[in-house]
């Protein structure tokens, strides 16, 4: 079973503070091609494309200008991404054995790199998968990646009797996986909060829950999809009603803090 996560917009390139293996992204050749296009982007173009302010546009132009796919990356992907998913994953507290297992069972989808192993060393960048970007292959990153990510995932499970993908990525990122080209079964986990008898998907909690489930699967070496219903971290419980073979629903009482506006 292969687990998929989304990346995060924010990144942290402070030192990890421990000795870790640093690997090379499997689709680095495609990244090299893509970086030739992103290097040509102006700050105004980046601002319009990403819908960000002038300062962030200048920062990301500098990142694209400095990006060199032929040079070793700066920090391992699972430690560089900084968002709710990665607060749930807590890669910095995973053991060396856990990270080694994750190298074969976890992939982080990426607009710049396609699919990343947790310990793939990456450069600073921001390039959301859903943004429009003209390349020789089309008008979007979905056009650029085409069926390449799906074929990469197929190769990772080529020897599996029954290939299974546990989709913990957002719709924006999972859309980059060509379902027609993808072999095997896809199981998507959904997380909702219950309040006053109503279930709601609150994104900040759902994102963290995705990371928590990925961590749980890593620590427990989950390879049988039938075991996924046992996930119970953070107060979540599997709900048979509302689930199906390809969609698993997990719910919990909504935390009191959910109604408060974040500072």
From Swiss-Prot:
One CC-aspect GO term: cytosol
Pfam families: H2O2_YaaD
Protein's GO biological process: response to hydroperoxide
Source taxon at top rank: Bacteria
Classification via HAMAP family: UPF0246
Family: Belongs to the UPF0246 family.
Name of this chain's protein: UPF0246 protein Mmar10_0828
Organism: Maricaulis maris (strain MCS10) (Caulobacter maris)
